[in-house]
Swiss-Prot record:
Protein name: Actin
Compartment(s): Cytoplasm, Cytoskeleton
Pfam families: Actin
Organism taxonomic ancestry: Eukaryota, Metazoa, Spiralia, Lophotrochozoa, Mollusca
Gene Ontology MF terms in the entry: ATP binding; hydrolase activity
EC numbers: 3.6.4.-
GO cellular component terms given for this protein: cytoplasm; cytoskeleton
SUPFAM superfamilies (alphabetical): Actin-like ATPase domain
InterPro entries xrefs: Actin, Actin/actin-like_CS, ATPase_NBD
Length: 266
């Protein structure tokens, strides 16, 4: 149904006249891929189709074929090591923590400040606050101390009804959960450790190439400061002489689409 809507209402194209490029999540089961293929050929009569892994397209969009992609969207985050265009499935890690959880967490900590956000409409407001005002601290404890001793980190936000709210340490406490999932009561490792674990599951000969090409992708990697913090945290985990580079392309929110566009025009 959603594909039908996309073809006929949004794109307004005849699917039988165009080859189709579909994307899939890392570790997508073979049955899903078969079903996608069946629908494209049998329902829409596509002349040709290809299914690409989202993280691989993000890597292509950054102009690379080897690297590790940290892809974090609304529902799930993945770390995907890729060597010469091929994802390495045995080393892919999944983290059930992403944008939606951060919005929920921000709703919770704003409630502690005395603001009440409960309805779906209010949730959208909190998502907007998250996208506009949140950032990742380079040193969380130090930032907490700064926030406690001065109002320099405070920002105000005007709600649709004209009420103005002030947000302080919530600005960086919210995305900190990506590095410390314990904030959300989760026992999993943060995105820095997950990336490190992915690299360590790869052949020792390619680790150097992965450390030097850590590519961020997806809307939940859009927080200011996230690349520097990632660099700092991975450097702490990695061997001392290792060169580590985190790449955060400005268009990373749409890098899967951009990579698909590149692949489709080859």
């Amino acid at each position: 149904k959603i594909w039908h809507h996309t073809f006929y209402n949004e794109l307004r194209v005849a699917p039988e006249e165009h080859p189709v490029l579909l994307t899939e999540a890392p570790l997508n089961p073979k049955a899903n891929r078969e079903k996608m293929t069946q629908i494209m050929f049998e329902t829409f009569n596509s002349p040709a189709m290809y299914v690409a892994i989202q993280a691989v397209l993000s890597l292509y969009a950054s102009g690379r074929t080897t690297g590790i992609v940290l892809d974090s969207g609304d529902g799930v985050s993945h770390t995907v090591p890729i060597y010469e265009g091929y994802a390495l499935p045995h080393a892919i890690m999944r983290l059930d923590l992403a944008g939606r959880d951060l919005t929920d967490y921000l709703m919770k900590i704003l409630t502690e400040r005395g603001y009440s956000f409960t309805t779906t409409a209010e949730r959208e407001i909190v998502r907007d606050i998250k996208e506009k005002l949140c950032y990742v601290a380079l040193d969380f404890e130090q930032e907490m101390a700064t926030a406690a001793s001065s109002s320099s980190l405070e920002k105000s936000y005007e709600l649709p009804d004209g009420q103005v709210i002030t947000i302080g340490n919530e600005r960086f406490r919210c995305p900190e959960a990506m590095f410390q999932p314990s904030f959300l009561g989760m026992e999993s490792a943060g995105i820095h450790e997950t990336s490190y674990q992915s690299i360590m599951k790869c052949d020792v000969d390619i680790r150097k190439d992965l450390y030097a090409n850590i590519v961020l992708s997806g809307g939940t990697t859009m927080f200011p400061g996230i690349a520097d913090r990632m660099q700092k945290e991975v450097t702490t985990l990695a061997p001392p002489t290792m060169k580590i580079k985190v790449i955060a392309p400005p268009e990373r929110k749409y890098s899967v689409w951009i990579g698909g566009s590149i692949l489709a025009s080859l």
